[in-house]
Design a protein with these regions (language model features):
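Catalytic cores of enzyme domains
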Residues: 1-170
Length: 170
């Protein structure tokens, strides 16, 4: 998180006004009638727009490097060339379930059963599971306030890369 602030400050000092939106006081989570639990800034959506990946059935970002990535963003007033997106505007292009109607491995891996091929990812139910189950376990077992789970992102075809059946889109 501090890296984003450092980059924004450095760009600003160089004459390119910049902010790290997720670090601004106005950043917040909200409940949307249409989308459930949401925030007013999404690092995943910025990564999609920047050409780094598309969304899977679990709502996680599938990148060239798989799902085990972290993104942070800095928005700057600076003229840069546009990065073409290998997947165009298809926000589900690198997910086997959405692209070919096969897979659903992430749904099978979910211990809370909150990902289904019929309805996708229930963010509120996932959030509740993490807060009520995995966070207390991690706190008691490891003494950390981390909010772990992520089982839907491992031991699946898109864990470490774009699935082979979709690789031609890179």
């Amino acid at each position: 998180c501090e890296l984003r602030l450092h980059l924004a400050a450095t760009h600003t000092q160089l004459g390119y006004p910049s902010v790290a939106p997720e670090r601004l006081p106005g950043f917040a989570y909200r409940t949307s009638e249409r989308f459930g639990l949401t925030s007013n800034w999404s690092e995943r959506h910025v990564a999609f727009v920047a050409g780094h990946g598309t969304f899977g059935l679990s709502d996680a970002l599938i990148t060239r490097w798989g799902k085990a990535v972290r993104f942070g963003s800095v928005v700057a007033r600076i003229n840069l060339p546009v990065t073409p997106r290998a997947y165009g505007d298809d926000h589900h292009a690198w997910c086997l379930w959405y692209a070919k109607g096969s897979c659903g491995a992430c749904a099978k891996r979910c211990p809370a059963d909150v990902i289904t091929t019929a309805n996708g990812h229930d963010k509120q139910a996932c959030f509740t599971y993490i807060r009520e189950t995995t966070t207390p376990y991690a706190t008691a077992t490891y003494g950390t306030g981390a909010t772990p789970c992520g089982l839907c992102q491992v031991k699946i075809p898109c864990e470490a890369n774009v699935p082979a059946a979709l690789i031609n889109q890179i």
